[in-house]
Amino acid sequence: MAYQRLYEDEDLEKKIYDIVLENNDYTDTLRINNHYDFHYFLSPFRHDLFIWYPFKKEGSLLEIGAGYGQLTSLFTQKVNRVGAIEDSQSKCNIISKRAEDSTVLLSDFDDIKLEEKFDYIVLCNVFEYAKSFVKSENPYVDYLNYLKGFLKEDGVIFLALSNRLGLKYFAGFKEEHTNQLFSGVNGYNNIDSVQTFSKSEITNIIDEAGFSNYKFYYPYPNHEFPQIIHTDKLINIIQDKGIDRYRDERILLFDEKKLNLTLSRENLSQYFSNSFLIELRTSNKDYPTDGMDFIKIATDRKEEFNTYTTIWSDGKVSKSPI
């Protein structure tokens, strides 16, 4: 059964469809429509969440809730085969246009008719809605267990989502899923269709679903437009947390940069990061990201100069072209 993501707008979807139908480059469109919603769906900076990740070139990836294909086109460059699932025909049409090398499937997210198993499964801003489409006593745990059935033996599930206790929500940002102030901080009172989680809450869900090998990443300033990918190893040591590129109307209750410095000194940054990117691994073998402790992404320059810098667990620093 299709469900309504609270941030969706039918008029905006029609505009996005028309833009995608007529353009392959959205630079002029974003200059004219310099609003968060257009950047969220069309900006190339959306790719930065995964542009650094060492996907297996010969691998396969399933993106559940691919939206308007804002990440799908990147995945087709990273792996051999990409499947994208959406629950509305209009979204499927947009994805097909933006990521022509992907296979797009119109499907409910809890009734996926695929026999193939994948190396990677990606959910970005979708897992939070599992209680809307999984009818069970424990929808989030049960949905993770359901997704395991589509993974290869050493596969990975990625969850990209906001932190219910993200610092920006205390500082005056509206919660993206509800367009309300403090809805997550206050525990989603009277909101039954969606919820985000604190670090301990999402960790409990992951543990209960039987995952014993997983890694938290902390995209800063958020997972929509990340410039820095922190990990538990260095999040409180390297105090650079990036600068938010897109700020909608908001209340400014305090200086987030200053409080971020305090949180780092108190070893608390991982609990108040605005977002999580979580790598859930189905085996206990070594993974290529084990030694990656910090990634800084630079894609705001001419394309030929785009790079990402990695600090590794052995102390080495590498710079790689994008």
Show which residues each predicted segment covers.
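N-terminal auxiliary segments of SAM/dcSAM-dependent transferases
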Residues: 1-22, 303-306, 311, 316, ...
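Conserved SAM-binding loop of SAM-dependent methyltransferases across substrates and taxa
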Residues: 68-79
